């Protein structure tokens, strides 16, 4: 049986058991009905839920040990973050997953936590698939023999249905993705997140903290409008105790396939990602040039790096993947052999 939004007892029941029953929507700056500040924060004053939240049981989340045990067979957990939307974060996630999975000895999972804007299934050409429940838990959708995906998209009755949820429901589904999905033994679990620093990010960090996260890869474009939000993302990671594996500058230029001349489409008005990484004291993983065929490959669910291995973007991506593998303690030559990388 496949869980869906038409079957709330299957899809959402377990995730919402511990949450107190509220009588009104949470205010804008609600600390969360399950947080230590529930019913005590400034935003709680005058809220109809204040007494309910204040009297709700507090303490360690009993699901955390279950999540830790469930994920104990996953060697590396990598978050992909961006401050600004539209910088190619989900595209980079799909490329990173495909690159890791290009080694037949590696098994890779992708968890799409962009609840309101899931795009990973489209990029992986599994948009019409559904997930199924077995005795072991929810089964992810397998793109290939060694690449699996889990996304809210698989639970939508119709592809274009909007997910209009507040924080607690999003948090509950993310918890269920971590607690109930039978990932099995993975070498890499890559977590794609929505832009910014929202409920989804806080939930992923709190649920994964005990099981160990290798770190986060931040994605930006060269212009200051994007870098401005990346600085906030860096601050979030530091406050949340998330190791920053490095910064990737996406769409850094366009290399003409005829003359190989590089043009700056998004000019780095303040120095771009490289200077930001140096100023903020984080690793710079590299610059990936713009290639219109990346978007086309994502639309058709194709593996861009396999189809266009000679593209400057593919070459740059391979270098980034090798650097990330080194950051998490793996031998780059085993992850992406030198014969396949430039």
From Swiss-Prot:
<feature type="binding site">
    <location>
        <position position="259"/>
    </location>
    <ligand>
        <name>[4Fe-4S] cluster 2</name>
    </ligand>
</feature>
<comment type="similarity">
    <text>Belongs to the Mrp/NBP35 ATP-binding proteins family. NUBP1/NBP35 subfamily.</text>
</comment>
<dbReference type="InterPro" id="IPR028601">
    <property type="entry name" value="NUBP1/Nbp35"/>
</dbReference>
<dbReference type="InterPro" id="IPR027417">
    <property type="entry name" value="P-loop_NTPase"/>
</dbReference>
<feature type="binding site">
    <location>
        <begin position="83"/>
        <end position="90"/>
    </location>
    <ligand>
        <name>ATP</name>
    </ligand>
</feature>
<comment type="subunit">
    <text>Heterotetramer of 2 NBP35 and 2 CFD1 chains.</text>
</comment>
<dbReference type="GO" id="GO:0005524">
    <property type="term" value="F:ATP binding"/>
</dbReference>
<dbReference type="InterPro" id="IPR000808">
    <property type="entry name" value="Mrp-like_CS"/>
</dbReference>
<feature type="binding site">
    <location>
        <position position="256"/>
    </location>
    <ligand>
        <name>[4Fe-4S] cluster 2</name>
    </ligand>
</feature>
<dbReference type="GO" id="GO:0005829">
    <property type="term" value="C:cytosol"/>
</dbReference>
<keyword id="KW-0411">Iron-sulfur</keyword>
<keyword id="KW-0004">4Fe-4S</keyword>
<dbReference type="GO" id="GO:0140663">
    <property type="term" value="F:ATP-dependent FeS chaperone activity"/>
</dbReference>
<keyword id="KW-0479">Metal-binding</keyword>
<keyword id="KW-0408">Iron</keyword>
<feature type="binding site">
    <location>
        <position position="30"/>
    </location>
    <ligand>
        <name>[4Fe-4S] cluster 1</name>
    </ligand>
</feature>
<dbReference type="InterPro" id="IPR019591">
    <property type="entry name" value="Mrp/NBP35_ATP-bd"/>
</dbReference>
<dbReference type="InterPro" id="IPR033756">
    <property type="entry name" value="YlxH/NBP35"/>
</dbReference>
<keyword id="KW-0547">Nucleotide-binding</keyword>
<keyword id="KW-0963">Cytoplasm</keyword>
<feature type="binding site">
    <location>
        <position position="44"/>
    </location>
    <ligand>
        <name>[4Fe-4S] cluster 1</name>
    </ligand>
</feature>
<dbReference type="Pfam" id="PF10609">
    <property type="entry name" value="ParA"/>
</dbReference>
<comment type="function">
    <text>Component of the cytosolic iron-sulfur (Fe/S) protein assembly (CIA) machinery. Required for maturation of extramitochondrial Fe-S proteins. The NBP35-CFD1 heterotetramer forms a Fe-S scaffold complex, mediating the de novo assembly of an Fe-S cluster and its transfer to target apoproteins.</text>
</comment>
<dbReference type="GO" id="GO:0046872">
    <property type="term" value="F:metal ion binding"/>
</dbReference>
<keyword id="KW-0067">ATP-binding</keyword>
<feature type="region of interest" description="Disordered">
    <location>
        <begin position="16"/>
        <end position="42"/>
    </location>
</feature>
<protein>
    <recommendedName>
        <fullName>Cytosolic Fe-S cluster assembly factor NBP35</fullName>
    </recommendedName>
</protein>
<feature type="binding site">
    <location>
        <position position="53"/>
    </location>
    <ligand>
        <name>[4Fe-4S] cluster 1</name>
    </ligand>
</feature>
<feature type="binding site">
    <location>
        <position position="47"/>
    </location>
    <ligand>
        <name>[4Fe-4S] cluster 1</name>
    </ligand>
</feature>
<dbReference type="GO" id="GO:0051539">
    <property type="term" value="F:4 iron, 4 sulfur cluster binding"/>
</dbReference>
<dbReference type="GO" id="GO:0016226">
    <property type="term" value="P:iron-sulfur cluster assembly"/>
</dbReference>
């Amino acid at each position: 049986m496949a869980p869906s939004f038409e079957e709330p007892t299957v899809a959402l029941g377990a995730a919402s058991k511990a949450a107190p029953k509220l009588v009104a929507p949470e205010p804008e700056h609600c600390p969360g009905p399950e947080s230590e500040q529930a019913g005590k924060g400034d935003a709680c004053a005058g809220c109809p839920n204040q007494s309910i939240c204040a009297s709700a049981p507090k303490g360690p989340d009993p699901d955390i040990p279950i999540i830790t045990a469930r994920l104990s067979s996953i060697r590396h957990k990598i978050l992909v973050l961006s401050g600004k939307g539209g910088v190619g974060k989900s595209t980079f996630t799909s490329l990173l997953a495909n690159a890791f999975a290009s080694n037949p000895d590696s098994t890779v999972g992708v968890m799409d936590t962009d609840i309101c804007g899931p795009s990973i299934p489209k990029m992986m050409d599994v948009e019409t698939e559904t997930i199924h429940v077995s005795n072991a838990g929810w089964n992810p959708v397998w793109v290939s023999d060694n690449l699996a995906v889990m996304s809210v998209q698989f639970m939508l009755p119709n592809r274009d249905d909007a997910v209009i949820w507040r924080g607690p429901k999003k948090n509950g589904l993310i918890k269920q993705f971590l607690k109930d999905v039978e990932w099995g033994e993975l070498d890499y679990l890559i977590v794609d997140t929505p832009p910014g620093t929202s409920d989804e990010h806080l939930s992923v960090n709190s649920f994964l903290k005990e099981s160990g996260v290798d770190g986060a890869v931040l994605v930006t474009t060269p212009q200051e409008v994007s870098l401005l939000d990346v600085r906030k993302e860096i601050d979030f990671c530091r406050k949340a105790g998330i190791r920053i594996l490095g910064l990737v500058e996406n769409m850094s230029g366009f290399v003409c396939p005829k003359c190989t001349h590089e043009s700056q489409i998004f000019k780095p008005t303040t120095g771009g990602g490289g200077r930001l990484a140096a100023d903020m004291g984080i690793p710079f993983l590299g610059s990936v040039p713009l290639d219109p065929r990346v978007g086309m490959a994502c639309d058709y669910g194709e593996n861009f790096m396999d189809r266009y291995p000679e593209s400057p973007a593919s070459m740059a991506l391979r270098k980034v993947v090798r650097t990330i593998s080194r950051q998490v303690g793996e031998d780059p030559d085993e992850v992406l052999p030198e014969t396949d990388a430039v």
